Amino acid sequence: MLKYKKIVLADDDADDRQIFEEILREIDPEAEVVNAENGLEMVALLDKMPDDQLPDIIILDQNMPKMTGKESLIFLKESPRYCNISTIVYSTYQVQDFYQECLELGAQDVVAKPDTMQAYREMIEQFLVAH
């Protein structure tokens, strides 16, 4: 069972979005996933949501066109409307400074972007499943 029921996933890779959603639905079929292809699309989706329908958590891929994960994180944490939404950034970057900077900007966590189905499952179980 998920501790977060409504999730926004911003990732420009359609295959990664599909894998994430498939695994999430296996774990909790009632979970709602809203997908965005980049940070700008995520902002547009959030802006259309009523306050009582905002997501419980936002997961951001760092390497997106138009608005990166870090740029999206800065926007979210500077916005009074969105600053309290839990946010995770994932990235293929393996640079400690990047991880630390995102944490200082307000990310709940920063993780290596999953590269296998099992790695996606482990990430979802670590961050989204109620223990």
Q: Where do the PLM segments sit?
A:
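Active-site residues of response regulator receiver
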Residues: D11, L60-D61
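Two-component/phosphorelay signaling modules centered on CheY-like receiver
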Residues: A14-N38, L105
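Helix N-cap/capping motif at the beta->alpha junctions
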Residues: N35-D47, G69
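Active-site beta3 strand of CheY-like receiver
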Residues: D52-L60
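Receiver (REC) domain active-site loop signature in two-component systems and cognate sites
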Residues: M64
